UniProtKB/Swiss-Prot annotation:
One of its GO terms (biological process) is cell wall organization. Its EC number is 6.3.2.4. Pathway: Cell wall biogenesis; peptidoglycan biosynthesis. The lineage of its organism: Bacteria, Pseudomonadati, Spirochaetota, Spirochaetia, Spirochaetales. Pfam families: Dala_Dala_lig_C, Dala_Dala_lig_N. It is found in: Cytoplasm. ATP binds at residues 167-222. This is D-alanine--D-alanine ligase. Keywords: ATP-binding, Cell shape, Cell wall biogenesis/degradation, Cytoplasm, Ligase, Magnesium, Manganese, Metal-binding, Nucleotide-binding, Peptidoglycan synthesis. The keyword ATP-binding applies. It comes from Borreliella afzelii (strain PKo) (Borrelia afzelii). The gene is ddl. It catalyses: 2 D-alanine + ATP = D-alanyl-D-alanine + ADP + phosphate + H(+). Binds 2 magnesium or manganese ions per subunit. Its main location: cytoplasm.
Length: 361
């Protein structure tokens, strides 16, 4: 008997359109597997309301939310639409960015007591916040690029002190980032003290916490991992960016691969570099209690060969140009089997969690 699976996508996020493209790829794989009754839940970009769709398309068809049935979540009862309990057995969230990768949806589904593909609340929340994630990674002795972090309130109190810290602790150039946002949105490079204020102001449009890192000339290496306690680490790949300062939003989604962007899988690395990257990826996945999947991104400094962990993506892209599935495919795991495995990991994680004692009679 087929299980009922809900594919969730869209979201109130700058990465809404990317989520829709990822969902389409996952939807096709689910159709190909023919193991699940698929329910597609679209989250409206403006209102955050969940709607039930008949299917997922690419490019997304115009969605008339006035005629679509709303999806309702009732803890203890289930997920409903059209006054019917859909009896969902597992949820596959493909919501990138806020509410999708920050532990919000994961928390909702935990309250609903429904298995969820991917990391749980803690792993998602920590991985999505660049500032807190970097602080934690330092405690694991995982190398990261020198950085400082601060909140908007701190900046409003004494912006000159923060600018002095940037100059004295990091030196220029630096890269300025919102702490919680994906796809390199809101990120800019400041080459001098004259540019730092405008870069900070731009980043503050997207988040209340800002991370500023020393800018290094580096290769961008990515590593896919799947599994729960027992994990599989795939051959790392490299993103070669030719006409951009770094792998920003435009480079990721507005450029045809093969022109300004080249994907090398596997990445050309020294043996010791390859081993270090896989070891760091393993430590991150284990210590942050990640589940299901992750893409761990690294910098390899061009001059010294020094490795730095950049960031962790707990819901990586599933589009046709996304590195996560490409690296899995290179090592022999085809896309539909990857999707099937991720769903199995969700059930395994759920069953393991249900064995714990929540209360005593």
């Amino acid at each position: 008997m087929k299980k009922n699976l809900m594919l969730i996508f869209g979201g109130v996020s700058f990465e809404h359109e990317i989520s829709c493209k990822s969902a389409y790829s996952v939807y096709l794989a689910l159709l190909d597997l023919n193991k699940y009754n698929i329910y597609s839940a679209y989250i409206d970009k403006c209102t955050g309301i969940w709607y039930l769709l008949d299917s997922v398309s690419d490019p997304p068809k115009p969605i008339d939310t006035d005629v679509l049935p709303i999806v309702s979540l009732l803890p203890g009862f289930g997920i409903f639409s059209n006054n019917k309990n859909l009896e969902i057995d597992v949820v596959f969230p493909v919501v990138h960015g806020r509410t999708g990768e920050d532990g919000a949806i994961q928390g909702v589904l935990k309250v609903m007591d429904i298995p969820c593909v991917g990391a749980g609340i803690i792993g998602s929340a920590i991985s999505s916040n660049k500032y807190f994630c970097k602080l934690l990674l330092k405690s694991f002795n995982i190398p990261i690029v020198p950085f400082i972090g601060f909140r908007q309130y701190d900046y409003s109190l004494d912006k000159e002190e923060i600018k002095r810290n940037v100059k004295e602790v990091l030196g220029y150039p630096v890269i300025v980032k919102p702490a919680v946002l994906g796809s390199s949105i809101g990120i800019n490079v400041a080459y001098s003290e004259n540019q730092i204020e405008s870069c900070i102001e731009e980043a503050l449009k997207y988040d209340l916490t800002i991370v500023i890192e020393k800018f290094i000339e580096a290769r961008e290496i990515e590593c896919s991992i799947i599994g729960n306690e027992k994990m599989k680490i795939f051959s790392p790949g490299e993103v070669v960016v030719q006409d951009f300062i770094f792998y920003d939003y435009d480079a990721k989604y507005s450029v045809i691969p093969g022109n300004s962007i080249i994907f090398n899988i596997p990445a050309h690395l020294e043996t010791n570099q390859l081993l270090s990257i896989k070891e760091y990826a393993f430590l991150v996945y284990k210590n942050l209690e990640l589940r299901g999947m992750a893409r761990v991104d690294f910098f390899v400094e061009k001059k010294s060969g020094t490795i730095y962990l950049n960031e962790i993506n707990t819901i990586p892209g599933f589009t046709d140009i996304s590195m996560f599935s490409k690296m899995c495919s290179h090592d022999g795991l085809q896309f539909k089997d990857l999707i099937d495995n991720l769903i199995d990991y969700a059930f395994q994680s759920y069953i393991n969690r249900k064995k714990r004692i929540n209360f005593k009679d």
